[in-house]
Amino acid sequence: MGKSLADKQELVAEIKDLLKDAQLTFVIDYKGLTVAEITDLRNRLRPAGAYCKIAKNTLMHIAVDGDETWQPVQSLLKDSSAFLIAGEDVASAVKAYKEFRKATKKTELRGGVMEGQALTSDQIEALGDLPTKDQLYGQIAGAINAVTAKIAIGINEVPGSLARAIKAVSEKEAA
């Protein structure tokens, strides 16, 4: 038995709510995936703050209708579509999907939308090669730490150099 109108309206509202906070949505063809594999994909996406929604293309069309940011996704709505919706950490979500696809070899990335711009599958894959948010934080913290360490070494070096110079002069005069 199909879903009731209330169920469909609830699903559309849920998709709209997810899209409200999303940075990236990409569409995959999930044909041939088992329920266990879809659950595995969802579990891989969850730590990245991303979601996998499976809905009829018409329901996704209704969910994005009137929202200029997500309009380009309509061109990707065909066949069996799963919608991967990523929040802040786009790179981690794409990496999680790429790992899943490598493990299952069953899905096809059609494309996606980011900030109102349609993206090809190659562009989305390139996003997965970027460092994650945590990696960027680590790189920034390391750079800041390196600068402060160099300043501290420089500040400590001035009195040390002065002391060595005074000692060398005093030893030279004593000799």
Swiss-Prot record:
Part of the ribosomal stalk of the 50S ribosomal subunit. The N-terminus interacts with L11 and the large rRNA to form the base of the stalk. The C-terminus forms an elongated spine to which L12 dimers bind in a sequential fashion forming a multimeric L10(L12)X complex. Keywords: Ribonucleoprotein, Ribosomal protein, RNA-binding, rRNA-binding. Pfam families: Ribosomal_L10 (PF00466). GO terms for biological process: translation. Forms part of the ribosomal stalk, playing a central role in the interaction of the ribosome with GTP-bound translation factors. This is Large ribosomal subunit protein uL10. It comes from the Bacteria. It comes from Picosynechococcus sp. (strain ATCC 27264 / PCC 7002 / PR-6) (Agmenellum quadruplicatum). The keyword Chaperone does not apply. GO terms for cellular component: large ribosomal subunit. Disulfide bonds: none annotated. Belongs to the universal ribosomal protein uL10 family. The keyword RNA-binding applies. GO terms for molecular function: large ribosomal subunit rRNA binding; structural constituent of ribosome. Coiled coil: none annotated.
